[in-house]
Amino acid sequence: MASATTHFQPKNVPFRFLGRSGLKVSAFSLGGWLTYGNEGYDVEHTKNCLKQAWDLGINTFDTAEIYSNGNSETVMGKAIKELGWDRSEYVITTKVFFGAGTKLPNTTGLSRKHIIEGLNASLKRLGLPYVDVIMAHRPDPSVPMEEVVRAFTQLIQDGKAFYWGTSEWSAFEIEHAHHIATKYNLIAPVADQPQYNYLTRDHFEKDLLPLQQIYGYGATVWSPLKSGILTGKYNDGIPEGSRLSTTFTSLAGQLQTPEGKTQLDQVRQISKIAEQIGATPSQLALAWTLKNPYVSTTILGASKPEQIVENVKAVEFIDKLTPEILKKIDEILNFTPLEIQYRR
């Protein structure tokens, strides 16, 4: 049974501001998608994973109302309570949009009703009086943007969240939200949660770049290993029992297309670069995301504590990704970055 670690002690994981806000988040965070709350991932299992992350210097945790139909929030909330952490020492982000089970007319989307009732339900499942960041899990074109921004502003003013953000929103939608916030003296979002990895780059590096530069828009990026593809485990086929053979079967099919085969070849080549610097393919891919200073935190997914230990070692390779190595990776990917000084 995992023992309680009451006080947070930062280790080697660096901290970054969430965009231009004053909130500091660990460069790696731990997410509950596909794991905690699902079958086989009960409170005890979740607690062991959260404690391992905490002991390594991670204090930021991500979930959503839709994850395991709300059970992810329930299990993670119970695990945190049993670990006895001081509320001021960790950061929780959750998301509303998809609902947490039954899809009734007002239990999904971004109406003011669902945004407020959805977070209230999330807080009840988490067993917390507030979250640090509440995010709109997807845009909702059926709801006026003013209603959306006013609802999130109300949650913050009511003390149920400190900040709000977006997830997989377009640059135009984020800009629209900022415009509404400025026009009506409301609270603007501070960060987006986009998919970002070395095979999925255009939206984050090009579409969102102006928002990062103008507003200092932050990012809590997900799928840094692209559902495991960047780990190298699929370089020689799809192992039986792996997520691509069970959960992401459509993605497995995509790997059989000419484009998919090209991507696997690119992963093989980049895996050789990882070997040259002493990293695993996963560690290189994770370190690569953190070379981008516009990334506030990279969300890790882990089904067991040992995976967290190995993935967090990626911080040791951030500085080893020199401009020459980054250029070589871009050449392998046949990707031309914008001419900006965004890497450090």
Curated annotation (Swiss-Prot):
What is the role of the protein in this entry?
A: Probable accessory potassium channel protein which modulates the activity of the pore-forming alpha subunit.
> What name has this protein been given in UniProt?
Putative voltage-gated potassium channel subunit beta
- Is Nucleus set as a keyword in this record? yes
Q: What is its EC number?
A: 1.1.1.-
Q: Cellular location of this protein? A: Cytoplasm; Nucleus
| The UniProt record lists the keyword Metal-binding | no
Assembly mode: Forms heteromultimeric complexes with potassium channel alpha subunits.
